[in-house]
Amino acid sequence: MRRLHATWTAAGTLLSVMAAGLSAQAAISLPRDFDAYVARTMKQFEVPGLAIAVVKDGKVVLAKGYGVRRLGDSARVDERTLFGIASNTKAFTATAIGILVEEGKLQWDAPVVNYLPWFQMYDPFVTRELTIRDLLVHRSGLGLGAGDLLWWPSSTYDRKEVARRLRYIKPATSFRSAYAYDNVLYSVAGEVIEAVSGQTWEDFVSSRILGKVGMTASSVRHSAAAGAGDVATPHAPIDGHVRPVAPFTSDNVNPAGGINAGAADIAKWMMVQLDSGRLGDGSQLFTPRTTRELWSVVTPFRVGNPPPELAALRTNFAGYALGFGLRDYRGWKIVSHTGGLPGFVSRLTLVPDQRLGIAVLTNQESVEAFEAITWRVLDHYLGAPPTDWISTFARLKARGDSITAAQERAAVTRRDSTSHPSLPLERYAGTYRDAWYGDVTIALEGGKLVLRFAHTPDLTGDLEHYQYDTFIARWRNRELRADAYVTFALKPDGSIDQVKMAAVSPATDFSFDFQDLLLVPAPAGPSR
């Protein structure tokens, strides 16, 4: 959902790792220095708090919290502390579909329009042919993150309207020809679940999955975390310093990323997945047939060579299944997914033939932290030679940060600072309309241009002249970290023909799909 993205001065607090574990005796199955390794990871990557779950052979080896829920506070993370697991929710949505298939209410390869007659994609052929399976495997022809601006940042569109507006989004590739990660089609899957079950996605997943698995502390709404007592605060690096950020609370895309969970509950979820749907009482949430569907690659990835530091992670195959990704590692099949929201990133990893599951939930946007911990645990159980994953991922992060900084500096040096806008500022003001998003307004206020997305309050920004007829939208909510170029194209008579946008920084989250907008002057009449 979000990108898998300063020194924290509270090192003493970080190093005094304290956790409430479910099974202290079972924890000896992990390396003896594991807690120290976690503490070192957290210090290196400035993570205030995280939770880890490890299951093996049907038993909980570890379900434990480390660090603090909020930077500067004393409340500790424990095994029940809730984290936004973001796109790790997608496996729950795919499992819900699998349950309904087993009940005969859905078919994996039936067209979506059989269940949602109102549903449309841009291409009528795709509308007719898009199946339930296609909703879950990122091969619809939509571009990366296409349509995410309909819900991110929090918008006034409800889930059905987000799905309805897909009909206006042009495809980036031909149908089923390429992988491009999306979120909006998982929301459509949520609409399908409601149509055939008579329950909202939230009610179905809560009663038919969380309740039966025993995930009693978990919730299915982004908005629910705010009212929970034992909940982690999201953090992110802002202007070089890690600090708390506002949680994402909109519920219009819950089927793609709305679940909040802690280590204890995620441990239960992993055990059910590893045991082909078998619950603690011996009953089946789903059957092995659904497991085979969930874990079979549908959309293959092109496999290349990783950076030299990650030579050990070279894979022979990789692809996307149903709510899970698959690859191999040292001869073992790995089933996994990651998740990202503002201030939260997580990773869930299963090794079916080892009956091993690992989950790392963090309250800081450090993909490097969960990677370093996950691969350390995998190496331990798979008998792999030791690798200093902390140093490895620290070097990769430093290199990536350096490349991004160089690209941002280059954009500044390329700017023609002697140029001026072609028109007086008031001539740029007006209402502009994109076919799938709707209206964006630009107004002259106090001698400066201000841009506002009509359905997204957080996308309000001051336009700063960059060069020629290009401005930069500096969003007033600086937590977005997504400033965007705004370029006006003029007609021969000097009037504005269209407006295009693009992210300024290459590190901008892909869900800010500004590049997909084509804004044209809106005709007189009601706004859209």
Give residue ranges: language-model regions.
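A short, polar/charged loop-to-alpha-helix boundary motif
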Residues: 69-78, 368-376
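N-terminal secretory signal peptides that target proteins for export/translocation
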Residues: 1-6
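Catalytic nucleophile serine of serine hydrolases
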Residues: 87-89, 180-183
